[in-house]
From Swiss-Prot:
InterPro entries to which the protein is assigned, alphabetical: Leucine_aapep/pepB (IPR011356), Macro_dom-like (IPR043472), Peptidase_M17_C (IPR000819), Peptidase_M17_leu_NH2_pept (IPR023042), Peptidase_M17_N (IPR008283)
Protein name listed in UniProt: Probable cytosol aminopeptidase
Entry GO MF terms: manganese ion binding; metalloaminopeptidase activity
Residues at the active site: K274, R348
Entries under SUPFAM superfamilies matching the protein: Macro domain-like, Zn-dependent exopeptidases
Cofactors, names only: Mn(2+)
GO biological process assignments: proteolysis
Functional note: Presumably involved in the processing and regular turnover of intracellular proteins. Catalyzes the removal of unsubstituted N-terminal amino acids from various peptides.
Catalytic activity: Release of an N-terminal amino acid, Xaa-|-Yaa-, in which Xaa is preferably Leu, but may be other amino acids including Pro although not Arg or Lys, and Yaa may be Pro. Amino acid amides and methyl esters are also readily hydrolyzed, but rates on arylamides are exceedingly low; Release of an N-terminal amino acid, preferentially leucine, but not glutamic or aspartic acids
Enzyme class: hydrolase
The organism's place on the tree of life at top rank: Bacteria
Amino acid sequence: MSAKFEISFSKSAKLNSGLAILLKTAEADAAAGAETADPAGVIAKAAKIARFSGKSMAALDIVAPEGAPVERIVVLGLGKAAELTAHDWLKAGGAAASKIKNTDRAAVFLDVPGLTTDARAAADFALGMLLRAYSFDSYKTKKNDDEEKPAKSVKVTIVTADASGAKKAFSDSEAIAGGVNLARDLVNEPPNALGPVEFAARAKELETLGVEVEILTEKEMRRLGMGALLGVAQGSVRPPRLAVMQWKGGRAKDRPIAFIGKGVVFDTGGISIKPAAGMEDMKGDMGGAAAVTGLMHVLASRKAAVNAIGIIGLVENMPDGNAQRPGDIVTSMSGQTIEVINTDAEGRLVLCDALWYCNDRFKPQFMINLATLTGAIVVALGNVHAGLFSNDDQLSARLTAAGLSTNEKLWRMPLGKDYDKLIDSKFADMKNTGGRQAGSITAAHFLKRFVQDTPWAHLDIAGTAMGSPQDEINQSWGSGFGVRLLDELVRAHYEA
């Protein structure tokens, strides 16, 4: 659950209680709103004593003196004005949100002397607040004393010259926050509460936003020949599902764009079982499906002028007596056969049938799949970049640019025939692993065999979707990575 900020925008604010948050660049002599919030002029003295200079994300937190119109004043540094980016405004909003405690009212003054703050910057600041406010504590019956406990509802007035423009831009920010926080919720849910059926039901809830949602059952997938996906699912008593989400915001004649997510709701590794230490984190092995669901939420909420498909393959990988074995050969929906070398390389088996189904049914402009697919990508890139693999240079370049814009960064990895041959099998058309070397690359090549000539990109988000370092806009174990990135891609290039 999240702390609720009721955010509004105004050209001015009449202060009579609560908290005032003032912004200051490194160059400015005074903070925005200082005359209004601090008629006694104590900020300058406090800043001198604390050696506060307006360094980026540094904060000066003081109790307001008697006679001031507020109880607390926080001055937040922005750093050098010339170096401010959209992501810096996002971070500033998150940093500001972290200071809103024990109050039900706050005013934020954005217009720093000598700095032009446009409507987009104000909306980005507000988005940062909403992303930072997220927490997942619905299963806690008691809160620790040191945990942040903002009021259930805080009225926040953001003071900026272009208040009307900021209000208009903020509607998209609310949509983005809703999608990111939905993805975070899904990743954070315990696996006993979120199986394939329950996840599919969460996707079905998007119908209230105008998304068309179909849920394919095991029987329907078997009829379609999805032997790869069903092979993963057969070791669990929880039945698999394939959720197909359609947002029809574009022209009827326009081909859709498509996003496919790996949704392994819990991954034991199957018969090739994982070590016990850290296995609890495998509840997050559906981070790709969570991101796709969150993206569809955003597109529908902001009424994006595009036709978009979201498909998520939902299974649980368990090691019971009916589980698939190393050495099994399964037949995918494409008709290609796969030798299962390692049952812990299951995500690609789920995705290959979902990719083929998407391409065969919808004939999309492109397909982008997201998956917490390999530990190898974490070794290569850590949790700073997600791995990007693509058969299309234009799509890759657009994704990379969207990643830089949103700070959900991607790093393009190589593909090539020398890697592809590593997944050739003696007994089937291919095998599901290529050995220890180049593990993330051979996994991508496996997927590439199921996309034909359609422009395609694979995002390996194993290092960024869960357990990534906390920062100004994310304090959650499940980060919601990919939602903002893909929304920016759609917004920049694919809306009518």
